[in-house]
Amino acid sequence: MSRNRQTVYTYKANNIGRNLFSDQQKLASGNGFDRVTDSNPPIFLPLPEPAMPLSQKRLLFNETHTASANRLYRLDEEKQLRFQLGYIHDRTTRQYGSEEIYYFAQDTVHTAINRHDRLKTDCLNGEVNYEDNAASRYTRENFSFAGTWKSGVSDITGDNVIFQKIKNSQWELKNYFNQLYTKEKYTWGIRSYIRYTHLPALLTVIHRNLPVSSADNRLIATCIHRRDELNLPDNINENTYRTVTGQTYESIPTEYEEMNIDNAYTDNALYGMRKKNGVNYQLTGGFRGELSSVRQENSYSVPRYSFYTIPRIEWERTDFLLTAAATVWWNRLPKQSYSRFYAAPSLYFRYKFSPRWKMSLSGSLDESEGGIQDIYPFHYREDYRTVVKHTGKVAVTVRQLYTCYLEYKNTVKEFFWTLSASYSHNRYNLMAERNYKDGNFYLSSVERNHSSYSYALNTIGSKGVYDWNLKTSLELTLARNEGKQLNENIVQNYRYDYLRVEPKIVWAPSALFEVEYKATVSCGGSGIGKDTRLDPLWDVAQRLTLSLGFHDTDFRLSGEHFYNDLSKDQHLNTWLADVSLIHKSGKWRFTASAMNLFNKEQYRYTLYSAVQSYTSWVKLRPREFMVSVQYQW
């Protein structure tokens, strides 16, 4: 390693619940591009990724290997060239389940599932980044590629017995170029961004409603996937019979869904800025284009392009800041015979009353069209129980957002207080409809204008006592969401209310000892239609951490308590504890730790969404002991 040339090679392996994907993403820091808004590539057959309320270290059963190579060349004082190459191999298993209740207009649907997922991911990524940062100009050229191969297998039991397999890959190329010039009070430049993504995906669903053994299941699955030897077509829509080692199995319905998506996107713009008398004038003009295509039983494509200009003015003085902007768009989707011209204004004002008091106000109006996933007019199976079909119409969303913020700060007394409020109003031209029949959810869209609303109030107070080495804070959040749902052509109103309180205390009575306490107390309740009211449920999460340090040795003991209302008359308490000991000696570092000391096997919780409630469980990592030795040279 030298000043002009720096090389870093890394290899990491992990099976203790740590997510190493984020470490790889931090190395590829050049993928952040200024002033570029990229719509995410469409994914029609997603892998299962359930959201869980606990930290990943308690839930993630993984075996991960990562390797990377980074090379930096400093060509001179202004120029540098960086190469990065990385690879990730990951195997993850999850066991979880839920009991769900859907409150439809004419019926209440109960479902129950237990799942065992096995996911495998391989990812190869690379990047070349060149920067030239001279006194009067800045140049950046970034090229990156990524290939991700994912495969997920799920054994699902409950209302039905199902085997599901999803293969989901993504190959992507990106190129970003930015050239900026400055001269006195003027700044101008050009930027260009191009992305191409290919996403092949395959879904296999095998319905196993017969009580056959697990060994028989594995044998049947092996036979089904060897279609070429059985001389069967790729798409099996009828019951297929298997005969293995002289035994005849009952009929096993099997479904296949194969979709190949291509998505190309570009954003190119010219921009300029001038500063005069404390006022900053900015103007941006550009072109965006996107082409998405889907190959299923039929081929379907959605080209779109837009021209835009963004005038922006920023006026700043010692005690206030005023920013006004308006994005003027002309959007065109020729295949859908859709074109629209509109403006999206925004305003931000900040005023400082005194060194301690500050307030701000903001408001914005924005409009957007849905992607190919919202337009695609052919039905497809998203997973083992979800079938999707849209109208082919362009989904348009108009958003209004208003916020207010007030702050008080007294540094001498270590007291801080903030108050913020927000209001959001969204208007839609299409309404999503969800129906349930024969174990399947059918999702579609219907042309119907409707609106949704959300209100939020948040306040944070913090007080410290320097002489006591004490820091305290309290956060309070109130929120309400209102909207509509459609089921069997009947519209229902729904409302969801939410309360959250978060106290936190950090106390260090001596240089050797520290206590930290943090809690989250939340309550949510829903109202659906005129007659359905869901009981408010309380959830409490508390964490207490005791830290003791003596010379080169640190000891930490942490405990967590979770209280969850599963229903009006049933609740659950869960206790978790961890301990660790770290000793440093010169360049050596010795660590011993134990996780989940009480060896809890499962965590359960109940949550509400807008029109449903679900009680879920998830398998926890068992009691684990770990010893590590590190040496730094």
Can you name each region flagged by the protein language model?
Residues 9-15, 40-48, 94-110, 152-161, ...:
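Outer-membrane beta-barrel translocator domains and adjoining extracellular loop/strand segments
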Residues 54-60, 113-119, 162-168, 255-261, ...:
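Outer-membrane beta-barrel domain signature
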